[in-house]
Amino acid sequence: MDINQLIEIVKKKICVNLNIEQIEIQDKTYLHIKHSTHQKDKFHIKILIKSKYLQNEKKIETMRKIYKILDQEIKKHIHSIQLKIN
């Protein structure tokens, strides 16, 4: 899977499962390329979400929801996730 495919899957899953107004996903894999733990087919993504619904939740609860939604992608294709909720 390439990064563009992963981004589309992540967007779709989050949009279907959470009440959001807007989502942007950025590839930040370049930040990890020289790390000893870097794996070729694992990506670092930054997820920016605009959601009044999620703003009212504790960040840890939002993270748990997103990790549950993206469970398969995290196991196979995601090295790390940065999350920002507005």
Language-model segment annotations:
Residues 1-86:
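N-terminal, polar/charged subdomain of small-to-medium soluble alpha/beta proteins
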